[in-house]
């Protein structure tokens, strides 16, 4: 059975997004990126990263004076886990309802719809 990490909070997901885009990063760099979008205290980012390390969401490298944080799992792994959790909790396991909900919540581009068609055909054929 696949390892299941705790579901990240909104604040943790925001930090994970920074780490996925930047790679291994210091608390200061994460704080600067988040502050570019909204005012946040440095100590809040630090404490959140410490909690995330305890939960297994990130790893901390303590070899340097400024600790370096990186995600414990790739973005795709976390997205799959979150999608599966949402599928069960909000859509009663119905992939159809999840997809329709996503498409009605935000308009998809023609390119995205073409890609979805292609992926669905691959799943139907069993090649994905």
Language model features: what each stretch is:
Residues 1-17, 126:
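Short alpha-helical segments that sit at the start of domains
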Residues 5-11, 63-82:
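Short, cationic-aromatic polyanion-contact patches
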Residues 81-126:
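Amphipathic alpha-helical dimerization/coiled-coil segments
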Residues 25-34:
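Short acidic, hydrophobic short linear motifs in intrinsically disordered regions
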Residues 59-60:
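Short beta-strand "wing" residues that participate in macromolecule-binding interfaces
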Residues 46-50:
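Short, hydrophobic-biased segments on the C-terminal half of alpha helices
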Residues 56:
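Glycine-centered, phosphate/nucleic-acid-interacting loop/turn motifs that mediate DNA/RNA or nucleotide
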Residues 18-26:
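Short capping segments at the starts of secondary-structure elements
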């Amino acid at each position: 059975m696949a390892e299941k990490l705790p579901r990240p909070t909104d604040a943790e997901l925001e930090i994970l997004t920074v780490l996925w885009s930047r790679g291994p990063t210091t608390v200061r760099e994460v704080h600067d990126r988040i502050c570019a979008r909204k005012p946040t205290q440095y100590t809040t980012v630090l404490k959140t990263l410490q909690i995330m390390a305890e939960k297994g969401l990130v790893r901390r490298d303590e070899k340097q004076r400024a600790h370096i944080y990186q995600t414990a799992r790739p973005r795709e792994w976390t997205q799959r886990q979150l999608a599966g959790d949402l599928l069960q909790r909000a859509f009663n396991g119905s992939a159809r309802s999840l997809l329709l909900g996503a498409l009605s919540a935000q308009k998809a581009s023609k390119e995205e719809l073409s890609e979805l068609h292609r992926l669905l055909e691959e799943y139907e054929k069993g090649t994905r």
